Amino acid sequence: MSFQPSSYIVTLDEVRSKIEACVSDINEWMTDNKLKLNNDKTELLILHAHHRPSPSLDSVYADTELIKASESVKNIGVWFDKTLLMKKHVNSVCKTAFYQLRHLATIRRFLSYQHFEILIHAFVTSRLDYCNSLLSGLPQNLLQKLQYVQNAAARLLSFTQKTEHITPILKELHWLPVAVRIEFKILVLVFKAYHGIAPHYISDMITKYEPTRSLRSSSKRLLVVPRHNLKTYGRRAFSVSGPMLWNSLLNNIRETETLSTFKKQIKTFLFKRSF
């Protein structure tokens, strides 16, 4: 549920009552359908911009159980914090990935390059790529933490020292940097949405650019970039970042009809831009 700042629209008591009413409706629906709401797993997360003070709403009631607000919650393997800066998620990914790298390092000399690369992608790269479209627009210092993980994996795979520059290594491995991999994921989602092969809740977030009169840009398959505020929040939204990245592609890439060909073309495009 979303609310405007309490001073403009509603008081915190009204916000609390609306949330509790929503939970009550959910509980009633579940009861009618022979289900039960697990209050022990019910969590409350109050989201707010990092430049605004935290709302004083600290708890609500779910039936008779008092649910206190959490600093962060985990959903489908991703940690969300109250300012959506994803700090806990980034730190969790880095901790787990470095743990896996330390263990993989003990068996590196026993495996061939091809077999060890498979392990790197299975235990490390998969963690960096999981839900990484949510990391779009994060501060550079957070993305750099994830880049350190990829750099360490590249050095371990290629038997190179920390003193050697990482860019030639990533280029030789043909690995896109972490920030660019995020762009790759978003562009794939935009392609699916544009061609109607994405879920409706994703497709509904993009709008094709259709000028009212005939223009040269009419045939370029551009998307509308919504008006937005704040680089740290508005521009991070898929409805904004997706069209911006899509419109920056070359015309021949946007005109691609198949997903497999599109993936190859944007990887080549992003790789050349990165290196």
Describe the function of each predicted region:
Residues 1-275:
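Hydrophobic/basic alpha-helical segments
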